[in-house]
Amino acid sequence: MNANPKFISANAHVDEAAVAPLPNSRKVYVTGSQPDIRVPMREITQADTPTGFGGEKNPPIYVYDTSGPYTDPDAKIDIRAGLPALRQRWIEARGDTESLQGLSSEYGRERAADPATAELRFPGLHRTPRRAQPGKNVSQMHYAKQGIITPEMEYIAIRENQRRAEYLESLKASGPNGAKLAAMMGRQHPGQAFGATAFGPNGLQEITPEFVREEVARGRAIIPANINHPESEPMIIGRNFLVKINANIGNSAVTSSIGEEVDKMTWAIRWGGDTVMDLSTGKHIHETREWIIRNSPVPIGTVPIYQALEKVNGKAEDLTWEIFRDTLIEQAEQGVDYFTIHAGVRLQYVPLTANRMTGIVSRGGSIMAKWCLAHHKESFLYEHFEDICEIMKAYDVSFSLGDGLRPGSIYDANDEAQLGELKTLGELTQIAWKHDVQVMIEGPGHVPMQLIKENMDLQLEWCDEAPFYTLGPLTTDIAPGYDHITSGIGAAMIGWFGTAMLCYVTPKEHLGLPNKDDVKTGIITYKLAAHAADLAKGHPGAQVRDNALSKARFEFRWEDQFNLGLDPDKAREFHDETLPKDSAKVAHFCSMCGPHFCSMKITQDVRDYAAKEGMSDADALKKGMEVKAVEFIKSGAEIYQRQ
């Protein structure tokens, strides 16, 4: 049973491990053009450079922060009350929505009236759902096409810039060498962006609210922001912005409780999950999702067909448009920000999977394929796509058009079924855009490295640059237990080529349901892949953190090395396995090479010698080699000598 009977809403509490601030970090807020636009960032404090290395100040580094109020010591966290509705005033001020009398989905009303769910229900929601007024469209894409810069767009522009300009100014003011230091720390290798317009020599130096608006209006980016999820902090998914990552959570029929899923969500966002998908497939899906949404500062995605299938006791052939429609409305009124909908699985494509090694591996894809075959007709998702668009624009739910025919092995990569579905997704994108509904496209899957760029290029062409959202791809099939690595390789590559969001893979992929440790491992692996892609594309400011960590490493500022990394806890743990004493945190060596063979220590010795003798580093190195050559000859010119 997936909702553990021991979970009682009255006893629910936050996971303490997810609340503590990260080491040497504090939450800061950057205010926009109005007081309630307060954009969170994580400020990482650095130690001064030791006197022997120049004794300069190292100002704080600012990094993108997805953890919401959870890592803010000033915030009062009560998961029974949920997070503050920070976007509520913006939504109401637009004057194009209305509060409903109550839930309008039949299933939602049934759950609310069912005494069996009373102890599981989220107790802290004291507002009714909102919906667009008749004839209105409340999507961020609709506003963007009208030329309107929303507070969400301004928020995103501030967030994407990560206070880079302020950091460089603080370097300039840090001392006599400030200008030189700013030039060094702001230096970045030119990227290869494969046509992404924001990058390159003539690209943007900072993201502006107007640029955000233009990209959303064009369909190259989406802002997943359901009007019934006002707790969410606005973010953007598009190839001209930082590469984002998604974390999957969710219960199953055999494991996990509501409390555990909320804990997984708070844990995932602590380590950098930009969005979270609730893929619950067991009982009490409705209640689990409510708890997650009300406590999530990041967009929440779902696959509505999973819950619809539960409503017909797991029999795909019994699914109907009416049941699915009610499920969409139920979830939209809870606040789901994006729906994965497998509308591209058409009857004509199903036979194309017959010769595959691994057939149809997508759960949603297999459900719809089975329905198509049972009824020998087109999927109701495809036939009712415009009806779905009407629902999406009434709540501002974004499409994540599902790749139900994605390859489940590298053997099946880039086959006719996969690419046929991709073309259909491109056609559906144009229909959604007619309704000003935001769209991203889901992608594979299992793809060897040499075929990855073809996937990206075809998606850009056929889907008119709508954001691509890929699961990996996994580049080989030989490593169960290590698929976070097999997929991380492909994720870094496809992120570089243009994918806007990467869906994480944990070590448990293909093996079991991930626990909290697996979630963290998947998140860190994919943050690494996304950052590598940002560097390769030449995203403005992407290299600042790398430069800061490299400088800390060269100056033996161990604590700063740990704290500037993606996982300070793991870095500190590995260091302390061999050098646990506090004195080792200031030592000019590590356990790899020891005190006499540290390359960075030797380099610093050369620089000290050069300064003492009044010569350049190169001259000092040459002089030192000459001195050592004389010593070698005087000692007998033997490579191995007795001590």
Curated annotation (Swiss-Prot):
Q: What does this protein do?
A: Catalyzes the synthesis of the hydroxymethylpyrimidine phosphate (HMP-P) moiety of thiamine from aminoimidazole ribotide (AIR) in a radical S-adenosyl-L-methionine (SAM)-dependent reaction.
Entry-linked Gene3D superfamilies:
6.10.250.620, Radical SAM ThiC family, central domain
Q: Which parts of the sequence bind substrate?
A: 248, 277, 306, 342, 362-364, 403-406, 442, 469
Give the Gene Ontology MF terms in alphabetical order: 4 iron, 4 sulfur cluster binding; carbon-carbon lyase activity; zinc ion binding
**Signal peptide per UniProt:** none
The cellular component terms of Gene Ontology attached to this UniProt record, alphabetical and capped at eight, are: cytosol
Q: Which organism is it from?
A: Paraburkholderia phymatum (strain DSM 17167 / CIP 108236 / LMG 21445 / STM815) (Burkholderia phymatum)
The organism's place on the tree of life at top rank: Bacteria
What's the family?
A: Belongs to the ThiC family.
Identify the NCBIfam families for this entry.
PRK09284.1 (NF006763), PRK13352.1 (NF009895), thiC (TIGR00190)
Q: Which PANTHER family match?
A: PHOSPHOMETHYLPYRIMIDINE SYNTHASE, CHLOROPLASTIC, THIAMINE BIOSYNTHESIS PROTEIN THIC
What name does UniProt use for this protein?
A: Phosphomethylpyrimidine synthase
How is this protein organized at the quaternary level?
Homodimer.
Q: What is the lineage of its organism?
A: Bacteria, Pseudomonadati, Pseudomonadota, Betaproteobacteria, Burkholderiales
Cite the cofactor comment. Answer: Binds 1 [4Fe-4S] cluster per subunit. The cluster is coordinated with 3 cysteines and an exchangeable S-adenosyl-L-methionine.
